[in-house]
Every structure is written in C-alpha cells, then in structure tokens.
Amino acid sequence: MNNNMCAATDAEKLWYQIDWTKAENYVKNLQMRIVKAYKEEKYGKVKSLQYLLTHSFYAKALAVKRVTQNAGKNTAGVDGELWLTASAKFTAISKLQRRGYTPQPLKRVYIPKKNGKKRPLSIPTMTDRAMQTLYKFALEPIAETTADPNSYGFRAKRCTQDAIEQCFTSLNKAKSPKWVLEGDIKGCFDNISHEWIIKNIPMDKELLRKWLECGYIETKVLFPTKTGTPQGSAISPIICNMVLDGLEKAIKNVYHKRTVNGKAYFPKVNFVRYA
C-alpha cells in the first residue's frame, strides 16, 4: 500500500470518527452567544465570536457535511470536483481556510420555470459552497434575530406550510380583510446593490465582496457580476432576506391610526413574505 492509499484510508477513518453531536452543540452554542452579543449591541464581540466559529474545526466539518448531503451534492462547479467519499470529505475540511482564499467563477445553467421561461442558476464549486455554508453559520443567527416577523422564505425552521397558516390566521375572522394583494419583486436576487450589501450585511466584508464579484462562466466565457447576489449560492437567500427585512414595518407604518370625520380609524394590513 503506497503513501497516498494510506493517507486516504486514514482520512476515511477520521471522517467517521467525528462526533457530530458535539460538533452541532459547539456551533449552536457559539451561535447563541452571537445572538446575545448582538442584542446587547456588543458588535466587537459579535465579530470575535463569528471569527471563532468560522475558524473552528467543528464548524468546518459541519459545512462539508451539509454540502455533501444536500440535493446538489452530485453537481460540480467549474472545477468539476465532487466530494463523494469519506476520505474526500475529511480532506476538504482543511481546504476551508480564510487566508489566501479566492472563490472560483460560478457555473451558469438555466432551469425551466412554470411559465415556460428559464431561470438562471449559478453553481459554485464544492469548496466555495462549503466556505459560504461555513460563514452562513455565523451570519444566520443575526439574520434570524433581525428578520421580519412574517417572513417565511429561506428561514430556519420555517416552511411553506407556516406561511399558509399565517395567511389563514389573517383571513379567517369575520372582520378580516376581503382582499389579497400579491406582489412580486422582479429580478430580486439579480438587482441588489453590491455596495448596500457590503455596507449592511454584518460579516467579513472582504470575503463577501469576493463572492459577489467572482463572476460566472457561460459557454466558456467569463462574465463579470456587478450587481445582485447569485441564485444557487448557499449564502444568497440569507442576504436577500436581510435586504428585504424592514419591508413589513415600512408598509404597516403607512396604515397607522388616523381620524376621519372626527372618528378614529384603525386600518390594518396583514403582511406575509415568502420566496
């Protein structure tokens, strides 16, 4: 047995020896501390805890586990690399390094929509997916803390059924509104300002800019990305949600208590956001 085979065998054993319960608890504990520090407006401590999380072995291992268990685990990015064996997965953990990291361009594909049109989907490499998932662990606690109360798309422990239930709750009373206005933000992911994201999303700014500006490859041609956050990346849904947070309050503030012909009027608007 040569050295490469020995190393692969060792890596396989080490992957199966990881205590995943301990890993989950470690990450969850740090996430709870991030939330506590954020609520107390100790933003320096938030950054320190985020750094600790994103540089920990357990968080990196969990990031690799997540991207090798989801639906896209058999779809490679531009480098053609997949992590299908236990050995490859354990070796991948050591690749998740902040120092010297440069994301590769996204692979652009198109998937059909119900209306017959096609939606662009950008596929990162396995390493980039894992890096985004790793930093998502550090960003998601803040995103969940600041999220609109009735936002249901791409949310932890929320689903389509929750959004439907909230709609039912808002509409099943005798004095409930009789009308529903459905809105759709055209090209939402594609048109978000990079500068707004960099300024307002509380995470590593340099890394965030690299992801936003890495470009995509289509028909073997590299195209730049000057606006938007790509559909298909692990961290984009959270960024999009954080961009839209505050919309519920802004809409409800328009319909505040007022007096009409000497009579107090309490207009009510129910809001449900789902992507």
Residue ranges and their predicted role:
Residues 13-72, 137-153:
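Charged boundary/loop elements
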Residues 95, 149-150, 162-275:
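Conserved polymerase palm-domain catalytic core
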Residues 1-21, 25, 261-263:
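Intrinsically disordered, low-complexity and often Lys/Arg-enriched segments
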Residues 79, 138, 186:
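Anionic group-transfer/hydrolysis microenvironments
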Residues 71-84, 103-130, 146-159, 181-182, ...:
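Short, conserved non-catalytic motifs in the polymerase core
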Residues 28, 32, 44-47, 51, ...:
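Non-catalytic, well-ordered alpha-helical scaffold segments
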Residues 46-118:
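Phosphate/adenylate-binding "loop-and-lid" substructures adjacent to NTP/NAD/dNTP-binding pockets
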Residues 102, 141-145, 203-209:
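Cytochrome P450 catalytic domain signature, combining two hallmark sequence patches
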